[in-house]
């Protein structure tokens, strides 16, 4: 299953409602699971981004659907990185001439 790294930042609305952040994170985790995925890690962070999560989802379409649904709520903005494991990269690199 593809892995995605999510860099998440609060919007003005999201930070105003910060007391609901754990509830919103749990709802996001449930949405990922309903779509057949799994939240691997999740961290609140200090620095350039407010929250970082790693999720597995069945495919890019599932990822886009989950993240659009998250975005329309207006509490966060996301940057999504599709991640590749060392073994996945090894397969690609082994085919290089």
Model-found features: residue ranges?
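A compositional/biophysical signature of low hydrophobicity enriched in polar/charged and small residues
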Residues: 1-97
């Amino acid at each position: 299953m593809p892995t995605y790294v999510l860099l998440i930042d609060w919007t003005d609305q999201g930070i105003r409602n910060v007391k609901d952040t754990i509830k919103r994170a749990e709802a996001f985790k449930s949405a990922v699971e309903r779509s057949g995925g799994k939240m691997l890690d999740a961290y609140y962070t200090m620095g350039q981004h407010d929250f970082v999560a790693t999720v597995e989802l069945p495919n890019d379409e599932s990822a886009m659907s989950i993240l659009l649904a998250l975005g329309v709520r207006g509490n966060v903005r996301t940057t999504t990185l599709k991640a590749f494991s060392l073994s996945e990269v090894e397969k690609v690199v082994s085919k290089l001439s």
